[in-house]
Amino acid sequence: RRLSEAGLATRIVFLIYVDLLWPPLEQTIVNKDRFVLMFAPIVRTYSETFEAGDTLPELPPFERNKLAFPKSVDANVAFLKAWQAIFDGDSFDFDYHLMWDHSNDPGHMQIARTIAADMQGLGKIGLNGYVSCQIQRIFLPTGLAMTVMGRTLWNAATDFDAVADDYFRSAFGADGPACRDYLERVSGLFDPVYIRGEKEWVDAEQAQRFAR
């Protein structure tokens, strides 16, 4: 109110993050045009992608200093939807695909696919944009993940395989298809889902993949 009285058009970003995942029970935002919601699902899994599921889990109760934060995408989106029920202003995703999870995928092919699907899914879950919290030196083995991110944010109808084929041809010339096949194999053999700890540690099939 004081900003409005002073004639200031300053906008304020507020976070849905850690303890603030839980929406308020009593307070409300009066001037939605003043505020922008930032969804920051820092403990989410990258084995799943953003979708607007028909059935979402109920929110667990808020218990100060005893909180368990959601890992599944559905559980994180459930918190987002609870906030959207009381705030329908502008919003964006602040996410961490290339902050650390790329380390679980040495080939970067599976995380690149997740990024593409998440960029396409932003509108489906009611978000208007994306800010990437990431390291800057993210181009080993390739810059595909960044390329996919940029192109799919620009056009949500972008086809992942078309971008990947174009990228590898542009970067490696006639060897592009072979380079892509190699990195697809690296991603598959390491199995990011396993490295994230989302499968049993003792896994004979995974041991065989590592042996290759």
Predicted regions mapped to residue ranges:
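Histidine-centered catalytic/metal-binding microenvironments
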Residues: 195-212
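Catalytic-core regions of glycoside hydrolase
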Residues: 1-165, 171, 209
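Charged, amphipathic alpha-helical linkers/stalks
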Residues: 153-196
